[in-house]
């Protein structure tokens, strides 16, 4: 089994896609050990994606792409500018606020970086902001998306760990807001030190105009969250409704979405969904082998020999995820490793909802750290900024995010307050 894990890492570093590498290693293990046949492996893989809740993933991805292509991102950016553009930090705060608002529609960090990134960086460049700060802040602010509902990573975590997605959505809201506030504080000090310009304060008329233009877009998270918690529809149905609503805005209300553009959006959605589905298939069969070999129990026993103190275990798990997140794609870690860490956390009384939000925040910090740093690569491409410049700009912004991660890990009330208040979770 250890050889299989090292084999998988070897294939991963050689450039093989995560899903293919997992399937290849799993099939090789089954053949070499004369275990159950290939037919069983195929059944496991198909069973892994035969899940109604996972249908939320392509619909949320589709919603994000529709919002990007329908001109909605510019409306959100202008609304954020009218609210906080006059505060010291100006376009830095606008960048963060726009990411927070957009996160309620897409739920994906990379969709945020790719959709808002170009607009945010151009605006900051025009205002004489340096590329390292503009690009670094754009990358850092995009991690708010996977925490604030709706969130694709939270849906995936809920499926693989059998945890309530509704509770996870509520649990991620406060940590997402904390990340927003922490980044704004750091942005304030950096902008003040560098002497960046501050926009004039928008008048009430201008604020109302920008709100009017963005209002229907801002209703998207209200429809999603309100529908779920009023019992009108499930998270999967909410994702489908949000896609239809985004399509309605782009074609009927704003009339900015063309047929050719819609076809391209569908292609991008299929490509993204196929990558996720392939990973889920690979993780399902590989996870079955890992479970059969009792690796999760061995891992739990090992951690418990070090300490049975929840805070010590959370520290060790966070360090492990931060280390692995620097060179392994975050979605792969979420699918492969996190489900096996949940029993370790549960063994010492750590709530799975609290653990899930903490783990996803940790993994999102991982997409900001080189050499993997997927958000850095996306921002580098859309903003035409050298990778080393982005790395220099994002490093000081990791400090407030680490502080938020520590607060979330130590104080579960940040994650469990809203689920307990609105859902009676844990009672």
From Swiss-Prot:
Membrane topology: Multi-pass membrane protein
GO terms assigned for molecular function: transmembrane transporter activity
Residue ranges crossing the lipid bilayer per the database entry: 11-31, 52-72, 82-102, 140-160, 165-185, 214-234, 246-266, 270-290, 301-321, 322-342, 348-368, 394-414
Broad class of where this protein is predominantly found: membrane
Disrupted gene: phenotype observed: Deletion mutant is unable to grow on N-acetylneuraminic acid (Neu5Ac) as the sole carbon source.
Pfam families to which the protein is assigned, alphabetical: DctM (PF06808)
Family matches, as InterPro entries: DctM (IPR010656), TRAP_DctM (IPR004681)
Origin superkingdom: Bacteria
GO cellular component, one term: plasma membrane
Keywords: Cell inner membrane, Cell membrane, Membrane, Sugar transport, Transmembrane, Transmembrane helix, Transport
Keyword check for Transmembrane: yes
Assembly behavior: The complex comprises the extracytoplasmic solute receptor protein SiaP, and the two transmembrane proteins SiaQ and SiaM. SiaQ and SiaM form a tight 1:1 complex.
Function summary: Part of the tripartite ATP-independent periplasmic (TRAP) transport system SiaPQM that catalyzes unidirectional Na(+)-dependent sialic acid uptake.
Record protein name field: Sialic acid TRAP transporter large permease protein SiaM
């Amino acid at each position: 089994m250890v050889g299989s894990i090292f084999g998988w890492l070897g294939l991963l570093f050689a450039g093989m896609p995560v899903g293919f590498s997992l399937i290849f290693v799993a099939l090789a293990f089954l053949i070499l050990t004369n275990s159950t046949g290939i037919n069983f492996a195929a059944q496991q893989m198909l069973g892994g994606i035969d899940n109604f809740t996972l249908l939320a993933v392509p619909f949320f991805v589709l919603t994000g792409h529709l919002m990007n292509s329908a001109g909605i991102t510019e409306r959100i950016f202008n609304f954020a500018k009218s609210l906080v553009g006059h505060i010291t930090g100006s376009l830095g705060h606008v960048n963060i606020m726009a990411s927070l608002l957009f996160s309620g529609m897409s739920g994906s960090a990379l969709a945020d970086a790719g959709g808002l990134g170009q607009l945010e960086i151009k605006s900051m460049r025009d205002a004489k902001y340096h590329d390292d700060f503009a690009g670094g802040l754009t990358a850092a602010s995009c991690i708010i998306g996977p925490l604030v509902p709706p969130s694709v990573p939270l849906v995936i975590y809920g499926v693989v760990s059998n945890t309530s997605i509704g509770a996870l959505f509520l649990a991620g809201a406060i940590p997402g807001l904390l990340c927003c506030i922490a980044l704004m504080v750091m942005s304030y000090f950096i902008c003040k030190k560098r002497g960046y310009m501050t926009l004039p304060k928008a008048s009430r008329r201008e604020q109302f105009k920008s709100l009017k233009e963005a209002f229907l877009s801002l209703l998207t998270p209200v429809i999603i969250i309100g529908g779920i918690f009023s019992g009108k529809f499930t998270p999967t149905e909410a994702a489908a409704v949000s896609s239809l609503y985004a399509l309605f805005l782009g074609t009927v209300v704003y009339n900015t979405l063309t047929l050719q553009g819609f076809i391209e959006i569908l292609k991008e959605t299929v490509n993204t969904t196929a990558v996720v589905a392939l990973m889920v298939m690979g993780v399902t069969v590989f996870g079955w082998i890992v479970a059969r070999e009792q690796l999760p129990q061995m891992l739990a026993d090992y951690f418990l020999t070090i300490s049975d103190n929840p805070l010590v275990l959370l520290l060790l798990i966070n360090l492990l995820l931060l280390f692995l997140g620097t060179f392994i794609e975050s979605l792969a870690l979420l699918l492969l490793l996190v489900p096996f860490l949940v029993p370790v956390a549960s063994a010492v009384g750590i709530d799975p909802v609290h653990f899930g939000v903490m783990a996803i925040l940790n993994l999102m910090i991982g997409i900001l750290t080189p050499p993997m740093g997927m958000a850095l690569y996306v921002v580098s491409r859309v903003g035409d900024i050298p990778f080393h410049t982005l790395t220099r700009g994002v490093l000081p912004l990791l400090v407030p995010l680490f502080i938020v991660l520590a607060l979330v890990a130590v104080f579960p009330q940040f994650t469990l307050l809203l689920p307990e208040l609105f859902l009676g979770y844990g009672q």
